[in-house]
Amino acid sequence: MIKDFDPSEFVGKTPTKIFAFGGIQEVGKNMYGIEYDDEIIIIDCGIKFASDDLLGIDGIIPSFEYLIENQAKVKALFITHGHEDHIGGVPYLLKQVDVPVIYAPRIAASLILKKVNEHKDAKLNKVVVYDDFSNFETKHFKIDFYRVNHSIPDAFGVCVQTPNGNIVESGDFRFDFAAGGEMLDVHKVVKIAERNVHVFMCETTNAEIPGFSQSEKLIYRNINKIIKEARGRVILTTFASNITRINEIIEIAVNNKRKVCLLGKSMDVNVNISRKIGLMDIDSNDIVEVRDIKNYPDRSILILCTGSQGEDSAALNTMARGKHNWVSLKSTDTIIMSSNPIPGNYAAVENLLNELSKYGVTIFENSPNMKLHASGHATQQELQLMLNLVFPRYLIPIHGEYKMMRTIKNIAQECGINGDDVGLLANGQVMYLIDGKLYYSGEVINADPIYIESRNSSPDLARVIKQRQILSREGMFAVIVVFDKNNNILGMPTLITRGCFFALDSSPLMTKITHSIKRGLENVIQNKRFNTREQMIKELKRVCKETVSYFIWKNKSRNPLISTVLSWV
């Protein structure tokens, strides 16, 4: 049973601290910390994609405040694999925290190097590539790894031996015994379990899905069938990070005597990096530039593109809008959607499919009758298998929303793990591991989300987002008042409204607001005394705002963003 920490019971004991900067009670921005005495190691540093209501925001990363405050303790960052929700925050971390070394698998290391090169103010000290056989030590920690099967090659779980017990972080994983390729290293997991795993931090993304997930082998078979039977061009979209599937699709295309055209920056980048480090063996003669596809018969072309999530600027959406410079859709085209919409993208994907349908193209989506996508995350029986292999003393669910975390607690109980030994945490909540036992410490670090806009990150963006959300819902109302040097109001205040209500249809209300503002301001100037000019301006703005707010709420039931401009001539 996980108990509350009582300091009086552990005088002179130094705990191993376990906490999440992000990734708990959410899907995205995975980042976890393990601390002992004067050392902190970090596992992953990801980004979370912004929902539609976060207007103008490109992504969300964890707060690095705790690491900035404890800079001297930071010893290393360990990356489990190269997906954005695990590496997307790295350049922003390196702008604020001096990380001595980053340990990462091959493809993740290459992707990180490229990302950092795009952020000139990010300081990268050293990147060390690790594999299945790597071992690293700091003063207090011993770290090694086990390979997992995921939707990107070179994916790993991380094992950390600490003075108070052993911690395993699962990474993203699944079991796929049929597809071949990189298998989850069951033998290594068993060896790690023999050490006694005190805390298992396990991903929960697909914890609500029963059974075993579909094998990629079935996905390849179905894609091959569609490509083989297509009489025109095939346009296939999938996640650009799903390197394993992309490699297989290219092989299928070549076997069906089709040239492959890569469209979309992330698709092009990921394939080129994979070829460079030897994860893909592709003959350059099988790849064609988009400007050259017109020189080939339609049935000899497969376009592999971005846009599976309905992204506005992605290649497939550009085609659907008829705006692509080189590709115009035809009724003879076959579109394959080898993906599922991630939460928040359903509407965008449906809009994309509707636009594509207007061209009369043939569209294949992932469905129970035609499996074209398999998740890279463990479902219920796979989680049971992993829990039985590791059989930890304590379980901390990560990488999932609360309901997913709650579900894996039930799964763990079926595997013989006591429900009281499962810690359902929040980001920032610190657990103490002492002599192999886990405690709720009561300590909390800052884990506020930090918003990214045009590669800039700042806590202040939260206020900007709130203003944008008010603007989108309630509109804006501006008051402009001009005074002479004796503080007399010149003329009447000017009112401007945008997105709040139509001013021409509300002339009596606008007149009432104008006169009320003028009377209120004159009353302030005539009857109040101020020590400073700043105090007077603050009071004048307050009167303007409260007057506008009162009348608009009373008459329109709106609460717009109110801006006041006062000037003296």
Curated annotation (Swiss-Prot):
Q: Which domain of life is it from?
A: Bacteria
Which UniProt keywords are given for this protein, alphabetically ordered?
Cytoplasm, Endonuclease, Exonuclease, Hydrolase, Metal-binding, Nuclease, RNA-binding, rRNA processing, Zinc
Entry's cofactor comment:
Binds up to 2 Zn(2+) ions per subunit. It is not clear if Zn(2+) or Mg(2+) is physiologically important.
Query: Binding residues for substrate, per the UniProt record?
Result: 373-377
Instruction: List localization entries.
Output: Cytoplasm
Gene Ontology cellular component terms for the protein in this record: cytoplasm
Q: Name one Pfam family in it.
A: Lactamase_B
The keyword Zinc belongs to this UniProt entry's keyword annotation: yes
Give the principal location in a single coarse category.
cytoplasm
Obligatory cofactor(s): Zn(2+)
MF terms in GO: 5'-3' RNA exonuclease activity; RNA binding; RNA endonuclease activity; zinc ion binding
Taken from the UniProt record, the cysteine pairs bridged by disulfide bonds within this chain are: none
Quaternary data: Homodimer, may be a subunit of the RNA degradosome.
Q: Name it.
A: Ribonuclease J
